[in-house]
Amino acid sequence: MVRTPGRSLVSSLRIGPAWISSNITLHDDLKGIVSEFHDRAVPKCAIDALEKLYGSVYASFAHLNLTDALPQLPTTWIGYEGGEIIAVLLFLVRFDQVVVLTELMCLEPRIVDAFRHAVLARFDSVNSIHFNAVSLTQPLTAGPQQSYAFSENYIITLPRSVDLYRSALGKSTRKTIKGYSNRVQRDFSAFVWETYQANQIPSHTLRALIRQLQNFKRDGLAARGKRAGLSRRDIARMLVLIKAGGLVGVARVGERICGGSLACRVGDNYVMLFSAADPSMAAYRLGMLCCFWAVCDCIHAGARECHLLWGRYQYKTQLLARPRTLLRLTIYRSWLQMCLSPLMVIGMSATGARFRLRRWLLLKQHHEPWLSWLKKMSQRAASWLR
């Protein structure tokens, strides 16, 4: 924590590339948290801690290295408590803003407060701190800030065995899985589900599988009037992530691939990067079956959680995934600075209102069919205007 230090104390705490601060004068919840900065550097201990603490591919340095978000090496903040690393955040300083690059992680409010105090003490020119996709264990209460929910990450907490997982599913879900599994086996005697370690599969074979699954996904979405696609760069990034300890599941009828899943391991968790099935086999609920079998593979591999990422699909909740809200969060240096940033404040408020309206409409569509019709008409009108 930061001791509201004078400049002389700040200077004395610089140790090479790192800057360490300890504070006993702030809120009791922050007592004992020590901050360390590494300017434009990411030490090995931070890379390892990112995976161990958050278990999210979008919080990992490996993923960040594959994106276009790194014009330069980020600055690393490490939070210690009792000599142990309890939090790591990577960020860039852009003019008077700190942009946090670490995403899809769940933080305690005291961690966010410790980071805020340390950053504002370390960087005099910074007036605001921005998180793009963060989950909080509890709402923030200290200091001027704005946030809005824009998506969810669906997460399954995995038991020790597949039998325990199966027994925890709802009765109707178990019946659905058993019934459709038997049906697809009965109608296609050569049907199999195979699991591989990704590093055992040649890159060209894995690339072809990704393209095949992408075609299934594209055709399935097209039938519902939606679009999706992966660029060559997206596929290349996925290959790198999958190759490092990933699991690959493939559904076959003889030599014909009809479904599959791709999951990469991050810490103790698996993140489902891709799961799709042939739309021509929709009558067998093969998409849901592929996801279920992939989750079972993660359990066999000893994982703690399986992240199904965003997208509100009924099968996710049927498979016991629980949504973790993702927030866009802006923290201001002071109430005065917030008042001096009207465009930012208005922009956050307007965007938050738009997402809340969108969520309300999605919920109402299940009860008011005319809203679904209105949405389709609006989409057609927007397409025609383009």
Language-model features: locations:
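Short, solvent-exposed loop/turn segments at secondary-structure junctions
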Residues: 94-96, 135-138, 161, 198-201, ...
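A short, internal acetyl-CoA/4′-phosphopantetheine-binding micro-motif in the GNAT/acyltransferase core
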Residues: 102-112, 275-283
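A conserved beta-strand-loop-helix scaffold within acyl/acetyltransferase catalytic domains
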Residues: 13-83, 91-96, 145-149, 167-282, ...
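Aromatic (often tryptophan-rich) hydrophobic motifs at membrane interfaces
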Residues: 117, 228-342
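Membrane-proximal basic amphipathic "stem/tether" segments
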Residues: 1-26, 330-386
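N-terminal accessory beta-strand-rich subdomains and adjacent acidic, glycine-rich linkers
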Residues: 88-90, 101-103
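Short, high-confidence coil segments that cap the C-terminus of an alpha-helix
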Residues: 74, 123-128, 246, 300-303
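Acyl-donor-binding surface of acyltransferase catalytic domains
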Residues: 1-23, 109-192
